[in-house]
């Protein structure tokens, strides 16, 4: 699918980043750092999340992807300052690392191929509704009920880690990136009159607003 068409279809149901002054300041500083180092991710976590991001939001002919847009820096900054309940989905990234290696029968991250990462994304993001319901139920029960002696199944942890990475990637790409706001979405820093009900195709050419 054409990226410009795909961006129109990204709904508000995706997880979004709650911006605070501290987070905005950290976003700005991490984007300008020439010798950037992660504040949240370990080296292995940084590598695996970066690879997933490149597949989820790849570069196209006319639009840069996750790597060029440095989305990993946004996500690392958000994870550093986010509330505890907002980062539950990536608290177990080491399990995601080990599970991805085991699934591909590889001994180290540098041996993983793009196909290995794609297979992992397909397994969890394209899983059937019944499987997703099982993972969600076990995950929710752990956090909502008495957790003594209970553990979340590994596959449920991996599913929520991958889902969180995807949701944060979309949020960083769509809402928190100046290039995308000005060149892909409809960006009007000084809005005109308010019209409560308009045809999106006529108003913006079908593009969503960069600022909501």
Model regions and ranges:
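Short amphipathic alpha-helical interaction/hinge segments
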Residues: 18-21, 132
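Structural motif
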Residues: 41-46, 62-66, 116, 156-160
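Mature-region segments of soluble proteins
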Residues: 70-212
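Generic alpha-helical structural element
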Residues: 38-41, 60, 64, 109-110, ...
